[in-house]
């Protein structure tokens, strides 16, 4: 047993640790909007609106080096796990991704820079995705006016952790299976789109006299 009620059974040889023991946490901030020298630079400034994909390659807004140096935000090296920490979207999901370029963050984001001698960033990505509903209940800040995650709850979450070799095997299996499922979803969506088009075309034909229904009366 993992000893963690909401996780349940895990292999006995997996290590039980806390997230804060394998990750360094960073927050973000917003450079002054009144200073144009801080904005429209080349440094991605990631906010919740950018968290629509697993891999974060860019952002809508960008800041300059001056903006970075004169605000609470900092440069996050590539390979960190990025979480939305404050947003209405936390009513139903925790958006999560990994940046493959250095980025800065706004104050509604958190970055987990991981000890890669112990854990793969993509393992944490999949862990958050797979346990999203449970983690939402555990991490939610009580009494907040806007949905947000409580840092202490996140940092102290217990994490069942296999060794790196097993993490790699798990990730490889997940990549294969999720790719297969995504392909099936895409095929199903294409079929649904085609059926909707046929339905609309049939209705159009029926109401414009293109279908002879006299023999069916």
Predicted feature residues:
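Low-complexity, Lys/Gly-biased intrinsically disordered segments
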Residues: 15-53, 67-71
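Cytochrome P450 core scaffold surrounding the K-helix E-X-X-R motif
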Residues: 55-59
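A short glycine-rich beta-alpha junction/loop motif
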Residues: 102-110, 141-168
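A short beta-sheet element
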Residues: 47, 64-131, 150
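Short amphipathic coiled-coil heptad-repeat segments
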Residues: 1-12, 180-217
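Non-catalytic DNA-recognition/assembly elements of restriction-modification systems
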Residues: 1-29, 156, 160, 164-168, ...
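Short, solvent-exposed loop/turn positions at domain surfaces
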Residues: 4, 32, 69-70, 143, ...
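Short helix-capping and inter-helix turn/linker motifs at the boundaries of alpha-helical repeat units
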Residues: 99, 145-150, 182, 192-193
């Amino acid at each position: 047993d993992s000893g963690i009620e909401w996780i349940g059974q895990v292999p006995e040889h997996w290590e039980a640790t806390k997230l804060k023991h394998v990750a360094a946490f960073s927050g973000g901030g917003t450079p002054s909007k009144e200073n144009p020298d801080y904005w429209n630079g080349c440094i991605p400034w990631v906010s919740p609106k950018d968290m629509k994909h697993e891999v974060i390659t860019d952002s809508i807004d960008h800041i300059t080096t001056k903006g970075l140096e004169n605000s609470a935000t900092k440069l996050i090296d590539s390979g960190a796990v990025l979480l939305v920490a404050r947003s209405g979207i936390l009513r139903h999901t925790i958006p999560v991704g990994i940046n493959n370029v250095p980025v800065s963050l706004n104050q509604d984001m958190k970055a987990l820079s991981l000890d890669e001698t112990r854990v793969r960033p993509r393992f944490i990505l999949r862990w958050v995705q797979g346990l999203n509903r449970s983690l939402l209940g555990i991490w939610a800040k009580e009494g907040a006016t806007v949905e947000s995650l409580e840092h202490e709850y996140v940092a102290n979450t217990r994490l069942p952790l296999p060794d790196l070799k097993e993490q790699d095997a798990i990730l490889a299996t997940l990549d294969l299976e999720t790719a297969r499922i995504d392909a099936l979803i895409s095929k199903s969506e294409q079929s649904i789109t085609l059926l909707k088009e046929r339905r609309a075309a049939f209705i159009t034909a029926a109401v414009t006299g293109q279908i002879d229904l006299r023999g069916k009366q």
